[in-house]
Amino acid sequence: MSVLRRIPQDGTFHQEGPIHRLAKRRPRFIASFDLSAATDRWPVPVIYELMACLFGQTMASCIVNGALALNSCSLKSVTGRHDEVVFVAGQPLGYYGSWALFALSHHAIVWLAALRAYPHQTRPFLDYALLGDDIVIADRSVAKEYRSLLDALQVDISDAKSIVSETGCLEFAKRFWVKIMSKDLSPVSAKAVLESYFLVGTQQLAYKYKLSPKTCLRLNKAGYRVLGQMDTTLRPYPGVLVGFRRYLVSF
């Protein structure tokens, strides 16, 4: 996990951080791929080779083979025969190192795609954002090579859920961004709106979505008369008004 923390394009510790960095580069072409059951279909040899390259074959055997490839279980088939089954793809549920292993190997695939697209480039490829199986690539050639690599690994990409945009639109970590990632058009959950009828819920909603005081009052069924006279009573006391607003809408 400490390795992931050092990769600016990884969103494990800050989900929106890679998107904000990518937005500063103002890319037009963006490919936001949705991987179908990636954690179930990701090949174990890919993870093993990456760990062997980073930490040596002995450590890779302990981390990967000891927990995945050599960890067999007996299953009873429909014919009544007991068969020994081992992992050749995917990862077991609850495995402690699952996220880090998958994320690191996913980064390696993106880097390999960049190397295949630009074999003579010496600078690291930075035009992407990654969070687990969420991937955004802001380079047409690298996106093409990435798709080719996943086809070779037999990891499917859902075209119906993927977004290939020429105007900077993408979906990343359940958030939908448009206009070169400058506008967040992600929907607000109905649960959050219903909880806004309580003061604590209103504060949380205002803090998360940066709502104005008038918007918060409208969510609590305030009419135009209330909104028009918001400042009337406390107008002689601007300091009190500012403090009261801050208390209502944010901490």
From Swiss-Prot:
Keyword Mitochondrion set for record: yes
Highest taxon listed in the record's lineage: Eukaryota
Cellular component, GO annotation: mitochondrion
Keywords: Mitochondrion
UniProt keyword Mitochondrion present: yes
Disulfide feature: none
Subcellular location: Mitochondrion
Principal subcellular localization: mitochondrion
Note: A stretch of 270 kb of the mitochondrial genome is duplicated within the centromere of chromosome 2 resulting in the duplication of the gene. The expression of this duplicated gene (At2g07749) is not demonstrated.
Protein name in the entry: Uncharacterized mitochondrial protein AtMg01110
